[in-house]
């Protein structure tokens, strides 16, 4: 008799995805972040659902309703801080996941990679509209500044901005629709993540060596399910230290002041996970140019499969590419710091140099390094 998990129509899907899935025997801890992202998404959906039960998307009561959640709802403060810091955790895992994909050449699975980029865009959109909901000073001004960037689009820009606002400024209509978007987008992300997995399981996982491992694959359970469980426990421990001891460390103090359209904060800046893109946006003096650079800073990832010149997939044995990869990581950290600084010397020139370096590494230096490494290894 066939085991139920192998014959039942529903269990069979789960079995092929998480139990009997053939997995390379040598994937490292860097491969844990896919499952950790799934865990983060579940945490965000559950905490968000409980917050939505008490939140009101009205300009007059939004700020008060968040205060009410923290003060009067049972463990409301915990749910709120888990949700707020869960976003930071989500982006940490997301950026490491992308970094691993770049380092080990996982971007050569084009369908999986492109859906991943779409997931990144949707996650950024979800985080942005979510940041507006508490209706603090930074929420309001962040929404005003970022949505205003669309006015740089020729001809239709201004109409597009007013259409998104639902009026002539960020107001009640904007908050209501942003809440609606923030509620629905995570479910779209969940559906897309399933498609992401579907395409991944068509090709099978990559491995640190970047070579086919079909001949010696092992079942996902119990080997990697145990490994993922250990990763999840470690991440939850770090997460709870952040939530219980440093809940406001990654937030902005200005967001504890109710939104006032008549009072502008001294430095308008987004959450830390968007600062690198914000720095690239600010490094170009032209508004439209800045918006294009901002979009390209993420969209450039879609070009990676076509810019791959090396005869090796992984960077594991490519010292030149490794050096450029870690330079890129350092550059992104520098851009993140610059994004949080005021627009004045010397930050302007540092931001512009770091932005040029970011695009140069991906578009020019990495493909060049691949060709040089091929020559060094005497591969035709």
From Swiss-Prot:
One of its GO terms (molecular function) is ubiquinol-cytochrome-c reductase activity. Binds 2 heme b groups non-covalently. The chain crosses the membrane at residues 33-53, 77-98, 113-133, 178-198, 226-246, 288-308, 320-340, 347-367. It is found in: Mitochondrion inner membrane. A ubiquinone binds at residue 201. It comes from the Eukaryota. InterPro entries: Cyt_b/b6_C, Cyt_b/b6_C_sf, Cyt_b/b6_N, Cytb/b6-like_sf, Cytochrome_b, Cytochrome_b_C_euk/bac, Cytochrome_b_N_euk/bac, Di-haem_cyt_TM. Its cofactor is heme b. This is Cytochrome b. It comes from Thomomys bottae. The gene is MT-CYB.
């Amino acid at each position: 008799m066939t085991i139920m998990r192998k014959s039942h129509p529903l269990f069979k899907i789960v079995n092929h995805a998480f139990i009997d899935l053939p997995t390379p025997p040598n994937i490292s801890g860097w491969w844990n972040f896919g499952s950790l992202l799934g865990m983060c998404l579940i945490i965000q959906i559950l905490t968000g659902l409980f917050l939505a039960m008490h939140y009101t998307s009205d300009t007059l009561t939004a700020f008060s309703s968040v205060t009410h959640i923290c003060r009067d709802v049972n463990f409301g403060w915990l749910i709120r801080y888990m949700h707020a810091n869960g976003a930071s955790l989500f982006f940490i895992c997301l950026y490491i996941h992308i970094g691993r994909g770049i380092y080990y050449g996982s971007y050569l699975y084009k369908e999986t990679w492109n859906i991943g980029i779409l997931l990144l865009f949707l996650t950024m959109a979800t985080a942005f509209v979510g940041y507006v909901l508490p209706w603090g000073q930074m929420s309001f001004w962040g929404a005003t500044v970022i949505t205003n960037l669309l006015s740089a689009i020729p001809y239709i820009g201004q109409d597009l901005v007013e259409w998104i606002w639902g009026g002539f400024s960020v107001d009640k209509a904007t908050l209501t629709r942003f809440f609606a978007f923030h509620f629905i987008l995570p479910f779209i992300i969940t559906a897309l993540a399933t498609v992401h997995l579907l395409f991944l399981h068509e090709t099978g996982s990559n491995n640190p060596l970047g070579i086919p491992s079909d001949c010696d694959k092992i079942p996902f359970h119990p080997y990697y399910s145990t490994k993922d469980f250990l990763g999840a426990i470690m991440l939850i421990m770090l997460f709870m230290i952040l939530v219980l001891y440093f809940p406001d460390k990654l937030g902005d103090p200005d967001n504890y002041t109710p939104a006032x359209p008549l009072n502008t904060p001294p430095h308008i800046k987004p959450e830390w996970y968007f600062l690198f893109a914000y720095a690239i946006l600010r490094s170009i003096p032209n508004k439209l140019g800045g918006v294009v650079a901002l979009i390209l800073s993420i969209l450039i990832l879609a070009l990676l499969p076509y810019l791959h010149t090396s005869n090796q997939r992984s960077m594991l044995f490519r010292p030149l590419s490794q050096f450029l990869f870690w330079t890129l990581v350092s550059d992104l950290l520098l851009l993140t710091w610059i994004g949080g600084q005021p627009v004045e010397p010397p930050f302007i020139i540092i931001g512009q140099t770091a932005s040029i370096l970011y695009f140069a590494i991906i578009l020019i230096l990495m493909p060049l390094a691949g060709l040089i490494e091929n020559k060094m290894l005497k591969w035709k």
